[in-house]
Structure formats: structure tokens, C-alpha cells
Amino acid sequence: LPGQGSNRGYSSAQLIKQFMTSVWCGANKFEHTEVTRQDEVIRQFWGFERMAGHKSFQRFFNKFDLASNQKVFTALYQWFFKNLQFNNLTLDVDSTIHTRYGTQQGAKKGYNPKKPGRLSHHPLMAFVAECKMVANFWLRSGDSYTSNNIEAFLDDTFEKLQGKKVGLF
């Protein structure tokens, strides 16, 4: 995980705990983390000296790049699926279209039946049917073909599910 550059900064562990607590409490924007920041019970529950503001979360998440995301989430997924009580998993693989409005990184014109000619993303997703958990997710540009790069996606997914017997559906 990215470290803090300042000795006044918050630890990565605190930022993750506080951010996840905010999400569990309904936050869906960085600014919403200010609500849990003011909650004394949450601060005492976690044993934090002080609570981080929304700008701290933005700076923390901006330190991640594709390589560090891959490293962190592969380890997180491996830990999760290793502790899962299922040894035989059914993997559902799908792709979909997300129409984008405005200018979003990676959005391109491609096949879009609902909004032809609009910018979109065309992600690949894999789900474990038994526990309704996302096993892998790759965000691709809108001009990607449905099966484009599926072999590498499945290799990455199987790496995250190491030690489990997987059936595809």
C-alpha cells in the first residue's frame, strides 16, 4: 500500500478502515466521508486519535496506479477466496456496456445498442455464483470486442482463485 509522505499523515490502515466504515454507512462520494469523520463513536471504536478528511482519501487513492492496483487486489482476492469455505466454484463471465456522458478516461465509441454513437466502456466481469462475489473486473474501452483479451482475463481470474476447482458457465 502507498505510504504517507508526511509524519502528520494517516496510516494506510486507518484510511482504509475509515473509508470502508463510511461506505458501510452509506457514503458514495468522497465528501460523504465527512459525516463519519464527525462521529465520535466511530473514532473511539477504531481507536483513532483523529479522523481523516475527504481530501486525505482523495490523495491516498490518487497514489494508486494500474500496477499497484493489480498487486493489492490480487493479494486481497487471493486472501478472500482462500478463506472461502467452497472448494468447487462456478464462475460466471460476462461483458456489458456502460454508456458514458462527458469525457471519461478510456471511454470510446463502439457497439452501444441503447445509445448508438455515444462514448462507452465495455468491461469484462467474472462472478462466483455460490457466494455472489465479484471474482475479477477489467474496465475496457467501448470499442473493445466482447471476447477481446478473454484469455488473459481468465488467467488473471484463475490466479486470484488459486487452489479452487473452477467450472465455467
Language-model-detected regions and their locations in the chain:
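Basic, short loop/linker segments at the boundary and entry of helix-turn-helix/winged-helix-like folds
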Residues: 1-17, 148
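Short, hydrophobic/amphipathic alpha-helical patches that form generic packing surfaces
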Residues: 14-26
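Short, conserved catalytic/metal-binding motifs centered on acidic residues
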Residues: 18-19, 33, 53, 57, ...
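DNA-recognition alpha helix
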Residues: 30-45
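Terminal amphipathic helices with adjacent charged low-complexity linkers/tails
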Residues: 37, 50-51
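Short acidic, glycine/serine/threonine-rich loops at helix termini
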Residues: 45-46, 101-107, 135-139
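Active-site-proximal, Lys/Arg-enriched surface segment
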Residues: 56-125
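Electropositive, glycine- and tryptophan-enriched low-complexity nucleic-acid-binding patches
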Residues: 113-165
